[in-house]
């Protein structure tokens, strides 16, 4: 009798445990289903927002320019790093310049600059286009106004203007070229890591930070930078002419404030955008022709820049920068 009761009790306990196990499994399955649906709806919401931004954001915003009426001074912002896939890229700034020059109501153009510089290639493209457009539109002057900073590649661009203005405390100059990197020779050996590099040219990997620096390759790279620096100097002399002071420090990479830059002939006067529009161009009404990225463009640019920078790091690609 006792054994029968014990067996019955064990059987009931087993049923209870089985029921509890089934209940827990059902609960876990329900949680998994809920989690999956949560992920699905979150993904769907993200996709909806992404598509909405893509469909309803314009490819580029220049609405202010398109609605301008009457004579005006065109203003184009040059902000941040001057480089491809950046807001201050040659493509964006040249687009803005062409639209400003082609507008029949434009009486003058102000390039409002606040930039540390960047790519000599992008700066050169913009410089050349300003000079070309000035020849096509001889009655439309171009002025550069440096606000906080107009250094290196930014000054390269400013040199193409008819005149350059700055604030007393603006930082102007830094006419030089730099290319920086690091040397990690011996680091991998200490970590017990063997690095294998395969090239088809003797100097193909001369910028590899994990290889010892060779004197002949260092000299070669310095010659490249010196040649690029000379191109920069030639453009500044072409744009500024005899307004430049005879000062041996002018092209050494030093930077000066606005008052000092005026004495050195790097700028023509002290003033703001509104002052130039009012007192120099003679049309106080300003219209912004700056190319503005849409949120979608900004997202894709940042994504592309991130991927490109990663590839550049892995491939050991680092070009000269004028800043």
Model regions: which residues?
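N-terminal organellar transit peptides
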Residues: 1-167, 178-323
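Extracytoplasmic ligand-binding site segments that recognize negatively charged/polar headgroups
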Residues: 174
């Amino acid at each position: 009798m006792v054994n029968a009761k014990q067996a019955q009790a064990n059987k009931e306990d087993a049923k209870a445990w089985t029921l509890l196990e089934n209940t827990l499994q059902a609960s876990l399955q329900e949680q998994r289903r809920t989690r999956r649906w949560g992920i699905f709806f979150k993904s769907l919401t993200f996709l909806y927002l992404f598509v909405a931004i893509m469909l309803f954001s314009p490819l580029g915003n220049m609405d202010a320019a398109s609605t301008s009426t009457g004579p005006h001074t065109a203003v184009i912002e040059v902000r941040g790093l001057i480089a491809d896939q950046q807001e201050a890229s040659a493509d964006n700034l040249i687009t803005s310049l062409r639209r400003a020059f082609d507008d029949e109501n434009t009486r003058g153009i102000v390039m409002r600059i606040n930039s540390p510089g960047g790519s000599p290639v992008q700066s050169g493209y913009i410089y050349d286009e300003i000079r070309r457009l000035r020849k096509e539109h001889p009655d439309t002057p171009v002025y550069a106004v440096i606000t906080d900073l107009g250094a290196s590649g930014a000054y390269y661009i400013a040199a193409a203007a008819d005149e350059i203005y700055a604030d007393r405390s603006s930082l102007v100059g830094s006419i030089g070229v730099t290319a920086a990197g690091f040397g990690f020779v011996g680091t991998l050996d200490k970590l017990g890591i063997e690095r294998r590099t395969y090239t088809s040219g003797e100097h193909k990997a001369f910028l590899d930070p994990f290889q010892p620096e060779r004197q002949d390759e260092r000299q070669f790279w310095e010659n490249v930078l010196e040649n690029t620096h000379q191109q920069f100097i030639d453009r500044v002399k072409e744009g500024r002419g005899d307004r430049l002071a005879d000062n041996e420090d002018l092209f050494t990479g030093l930077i000066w404030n606005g008052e000092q830059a005026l004495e050195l002939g790097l700028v023509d006067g002290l003033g703001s955008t509104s002052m130039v529009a009012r007192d120099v161009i003679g049309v106080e009404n300003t219209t912004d022709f700056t190319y503005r990225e849409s949120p979608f463009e900004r997202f894709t640019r940042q994504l592309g820049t991130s991927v490109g920078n990663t590839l550049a790091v892995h491939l050991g690609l680092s070009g000269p920068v004028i800043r």
